Structure formats: structure tokens, C-alpha cells
Regions:
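Divalent metal-dependent hydrolysis catalytic cores, especially in the metallo-beta-lactamase
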Residues: 66, 81-110, 122-130
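N-terminal metal-binding scaffold of metallo-dependent hydrolase/deaminase domains
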Residues: 1-49
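Short, conserved beta-strand segments within well-ordered enzyme catalytic domains
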Residues: 36, 60-62, 72, 96-98, ...
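Metal-centered catalytic cores of metalloenzymes
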Residues: 25-31, 55, 73-75, 109, ...
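Membrane metalloprotein/metal-transporter helix-bundle signature
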Residues: 70, 90-92, 115, 119
Length: 130
């Protein structure tokens, strides 16, 4: 089972419950707990003992991403969308699409593609020029 929580919004595959329990890990602490949610996180409870193999961790941030899942950031809008979806499915909740060293025209076209997707992508947060 895969559940992804981003900025208190829950993205999920295979969930029929409004609770998830496991080892909660954040930037300065870790503890056993349970998260209750609807479309947003409603409550986080610490639990003394828990019978779960789950880990609940912050999503990964990739600051230098040339592609993923067989798709390249310089290959157009559809490739960027598929690359973005691939990374999201693996737990990367934020990424900077990184250009390759290329001609001005090719780089400019890639920047236009990124610009057209930045508001539609759930994990594309910007561009890194190489």
C-alpha cells in the first residue's frame, strides 16, 4: 500500500480508511502514531505501542532532476508530465526540473514547456538551469 501526504493534502492508492498508523518521522522527532484524515490531515496522535510496519515520513525533494521513468525534462510537455508523475509515485513530492546543456533555442523551448506545467503539476516547483 502506498500513501503520499503533501502539504497536508493526501494522495493515496488503495485506501478505504481515514486513518493510517506507523512510525511518524519528521525533521526533529520520530514517534509511533496515527494520522486521521479526510482530504486533509485532521489529527496526529502519539501512540505508546503500535502494531504496524508502516513509516510515515516527509516526501523527498529533488533539486536537480533531469528526468525519470524513461522521460527527459528536455523532451516536451508530455515527457515532463510523465517524469513528474513517475517521481511522485516514488515519493518525490517536490522537484526542480533541470535542463541539459543545450542550444539556446532548445533550452528556451524547455523553459516554455516548464512554464506551461508549473501550475498544473503537483510536484514541479521550479527549474534548475544547467
Amino acid at each position: 500500500m502506498f500513501r503520499l501526504y503533501k502539504q497536508k493534502t493526501i494522495f493515496t492508492e488503495m485506501t478505504n480508511s481515514n486513518k493510517v498508523s506507523g512510525k511518524i518521522i519528521n525533521y526533529n522527532d520520530s514517534y509511533s502514531g496515527e494520522i486521521t484524515f479526510d482530504e486533509n490531515i485532521l489529527n496526529i496522535n502519539k501512540i505508546e505501542e503500535i502494531n504496524s510496519e508502516n513509516y510515515i515520513i516527509p516526501g523527498f525533494v529533488d533539486l536537480h532532476c533531469h528526468g525519470g521513468g524513461g522521460f527527459d525534462t528536455m523532451d516536451g510537455v508530455q515527457a515532463i508530465q510523465k517524469m513528474s508523475s513517475y517521481h511522485l509515485s516514488k515519493g518525490t513530492t517536490s522537484l526542480l526540473a533541470t535542463t541539459w546543456t543545450s542550444s539556446f533555442e532548445h533550452t528556451y523551448a524547455a523553459l516554455n514547456d516548464f512554464n506551461s506545467l508549473i501550475d498544473m503539476s503537483s510536484n514541479l516547483i521550479g527549474v534548475h538551469l544547467e
